Amino acid sequence: MQQVVYVASPESQQIHVWQLGAQGNLTLLQTVEVPGQVQPMAIAPNKRHLYVGVRPDFRVLSYRIDEQGKLTEAGVASLPGSPTHLSTDNDGRFLFSASYSGACVSVSPIDADGIVGEPIQQLDGLEGCHSTNIDPTNTVVWAPCLKEDRIRLYDLGSVGELSIHRQAEMTTVSGAGPRHMAFHPNQRFAYCVNELDSSVDVYQLDAASGDVQKVQTLDAMPAGFSDTRWAADIHITPNGNFLYISDRTASLLSVFQISEDGSTLTLTGHQPTETQPRGFNIDHTGEFLISAGQKSQHIEVYHIDQHTGDLQPLARYAVGQGPMWVAVLALD
């Protein structure tokens, strides 16, 4: 499997494009100078485009991906707020942008050539909205709102319009601050990391009714941790066996084993990582994790033990200034 890793560094306005080798080694393919502070990235489902959010002029850039994984800018469109998170629906027809500071979610069309157009809908009043996440059925968008301690749910219509889902929201404990999400491959469970108390919530999805219920909440930090909690990112291995969460104050990656049915997490350990790990990701084989240090100007690659989920550091690589986002593409 040929894989490419994209690392966004807003302070130097760059995307570094790396080839990921079979042993976890990285080879630099390209350094892209971006017209703006690049932050969130999303890969199109058909793997032909990379969508990038930039500021201070709030825009989304569409990059064409060639057969090697290299990028060529192909389009630009405006966004209503500073982009905090980008995602698409599973068919690649619509781009969703969450804006934390703008307290909004927007929907933009993606044309037949894979280029994002101007927004067609804007939902306001979502305080601290931190991400938009399409569910496995491609029908419901989950929008964690950190300042509201709740996840809002929206139905996705045929032309991209979002409307309030029958179950309008799920609430967290007070002060948790829901942020980023991941879905289990079996499509029956979702996981949300809470930024302000560094916990993770497990949600069960009822495919028949569309209802959601919280079934577990677990602390991600070591016992006795007394510093400020500041969780950031969450990802799950493709086989659904392991889940990881990053905390920026502690510069740690928390390791969880997932029960066979996906319903239960067990915290098994912690791995020190790059300073202030705001973003990380897992490759498509489930063998490697790439962590970005927002304050270290480096990324680090780890091998994932397939029996325990433990992380073995392999190598560090210098990138741009303030790296915040990691995306991984499987070319074949």
Swiss-Prot record:
GO terms for cellular component: cytosol. It comes from the Bacteria. Gene3D superfamilies: YVTN repeat-like/Quinoprotein amine dehydrogenase. Its EC number is 3.1.1.31. Coiled coil: none annotated. It holds the Pfam family Lactonase. InterPro entries: 6-phosphogluconolactonase_YbhE, Cycloisomerase_2, Lactonase_7-beta_prop, N2O_reductase_N, WD40/YVTN_repeat-like_dom_sf. Pathway: Carbohydrate degradation; pentose phosphate pathway; D-ribulose 5-phosphate from D-glucose 6-phosphate (oxidative stage): step 2/3. One of its GO terms (biological process) is glucose metabolic process. One of its GO terms (molecular function) is 6-phosphogluconolactonase activity. Keywords: Carbohydrate metabolism, Glucose metabolism, Hydrolase. It is an enzyme of class 3 (hydrolase). It catalyses: 6-phospho-D-glucono-1,5-lactone + H2O = 6-phospho-D-gluconate + H(+). NCBIfam families: PRK11028.1. Catalyzes the hydrolysis of 6-phosphogluconolactone to 6-phosphogluconate. Belongs to the cycloisomerase 2 family. HAMAP family: 6P_gluconolactonase. This is 6-phosphogluconolactonase. The lineage of its organism: Bacteria, Pseudomonadati, Pseudomonadota, Gammaproteobacteria, Enterobacterales. The gene is pgl.
